[in-house]
Amino acid sequence: YKGEKPAVIDFYATWCGPCRMVAPLLKSLAKEYKDQIVVYKVDTDKQKELSAAMGIQSLPTIIFIPKTGQPQIIIGAANKTTFRKAIEEVLLKE
């Protein structure tokens, strides 16, 4: 990963109910951590090749990509506490 900040990638679809539940949580966390991380959203219906290349089979799939180390994946809807823990422990730990 070559970005300047750790990243969160949210693979979603507009028709996906759990994706719609997760979206405002990630938006809120993106604001909260705006100086520390970058949040990307990928519509799997519009970005089929990227989704296939990343092996996305279930929605939502959220990938936490640290500057160094292995990415971590959460598949399915999770709560804000779970996402915050992943940001703190995977992306921001020193």
Spans of model-derived segments:
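Typically the conserved alpha-helix immediately C-terminal to a functionally engaged Cys/Sec
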Residues: 20-33
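Aromatic-flanked redox-active Cys/Sec active sites in thiol-based oxidoreductases
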Residues: 10-15
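A short beta-strand-turn-helix
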Residues: 1-7
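Structural micro-motif
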Residues: 7, 48, 54-65
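Conserved acidic residues
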Residues: 43-45
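Non-catalytic, surface beta->alpha helical segment in thiol-disulfide oxidoreductase systems
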Residues: 58, 63-94
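The canonical Cys-X-X-Cys-His
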Residues: 16-19, 62
